[in-house]
Amino acid sequence: MTLLKSLCVFFFLLAISFTFTQAARFDITNNCPYTVWPAALPTGGGQQLTQGQTWSLDVPAGTTSGRIWGRTGCNFDGSGRGSCSTGDCGGVLQCKLSGAPPTTLAEFSLNQFNNLDFYDLSVIDGFNVPMQLSPTSGGCTTLTCLADKCPDAYLFPDDNTKTHSCPSGTNYRLVFCP
């Protein structure tokens, strides 16, 4: 009975350890001299960041087609209803829809093929806020987009050179106005 109990505890701890090491944290910081309302799909919703504020977002392993973008010129009431000049997602603070163009996008899929995360920046939907996406572990590529048509970002859908990979379990830092 003791062996069975020990094995159950071992596999439980192993499962928890694997799950936590494969999830990712995105620390989203606003360095812009104006307020940015970052939004995140499929988890996270959205919130307001004034200059210098950071929002930490935990994203589960296995998340695919994740997106983070900045909204500008927003005005929300106490119930979270309102609108944004750029990146609006159906007139709500907590986004459940993608942002309306123009939006500079950080895109990601976590713990995919060969235990890798895949990430990119995209200005296919237009450019609205300067952005930098950097993995926190060494050896992975930092992407920066300071203006429309920036060289680190997708400019058209079939550009196979803009997606980058990093080992699963990596955390990321996204900075508006780096």
Regions found by a protein language model. Name each.
Residues 2-178:
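Extracellular low-complexity, O-glycosylation-prone Ser/Thr/Pro/Gly-rich "stalks"
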